[in-house]
Amino acid sequence: MTRRLLMVLVLATALVVGGCGNKEKTTTEASTEGIYLDVGGLKYQVQISRILNPSDIEDRNYLTQLPQGTLPPKADEAWFGVWIRVQNTNDGKSLPTASNFEIRDTQDNVFRPYAQVGNVFAYQPVDKLGPQEVLPNPDAPAGFGPIQGSLILFKLTNTSLANRPLEFRIISPTDPTNVGTVDLDV
């Protein structure tokens, strides 16, 4: 009888302890691309990152709508793209998406993105991403293309590309201390 009672108690304890683990873990750091980062109540995922080649037909489309006066990369620089996907997993709350991003190398050099207003592949922050919505919109060119992410464009030095890992940082629009970081696969 005591053995049976002990077995029932062990099973009951396991059920109680197992039921306590329903809360999802919040992740703000990732050592590789593809991991969802929780920033500002939204989930951000780096789909891919890579150097862009202005001579490549596909890449030329990513390098349009740059601010007036933007110079092409110098001999020791390169265009570098980070494609992200943003998801609002909340059921009843619209939230703003991040507009502040940066890349840091191991020497603490910081790079900020170029705005590309009007480029259909470029990331455009929104004031309110609705409940259960995704950015880019799945029906937009950035959403239904092979990458399924919006481009954030940087100009990096070749030296910084060698100072790996590069750290991509997403700063929350509502709390600048809430920062998501991911090491980019270069």
PLM regions and their residue ranges:
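Sec-dependent bacterial lipoprotein signal peptides
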Residues: 1-18
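Conserved functional micro-motifs across diverse proteins
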Residues: 20-186
